[in-house]
Amino acid sequence: MVKFKHKTDKRDSNLRQAFIKLLLKHPVRDVKFSGRKISLTFFGHRLSDKIVSLREPHVAEWSRRRKEIFIDKKISTNDRRKSFKALCVHEVIEKFLTEHFGFRTDKESHIIATQKEKEYLKYLGGNWESHELIVYWDWHSYGEH
């Protein structure tokens, strides 16, 4: 009986990894910003959330209760507009994957969302290294490590 459970766990793990690889290859489409909302299509699902700009110690976060994402107000300035948009894409996708597929936020959803954030930033003509520095210094300005 123990061997059977082990084989099932291994098979489930392999299927999960294959699904993650599939999601990593799947593009984000039709990204639109309208007022304080973002909408996009990912993996055949139309997703939308309200964007709230406030003091956010984790740079960006998503609500577990409402259709909202939170982006630190320092990132929403005009000189950081591309980073702001890329972070919005990241949060919407991370929220969707965690809620819809039950992925672990830090180990699975975050990896996929970061890849989609990077792809979208490249599409906007942004620089990934500059974006990472903006996020890094914003995160550390609140004493996070």
Language-model features: where?
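Intrinsic-disorder-driven secretion/translocation and chaperone-binding regions of pathogen effectors
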Residues: 1-3
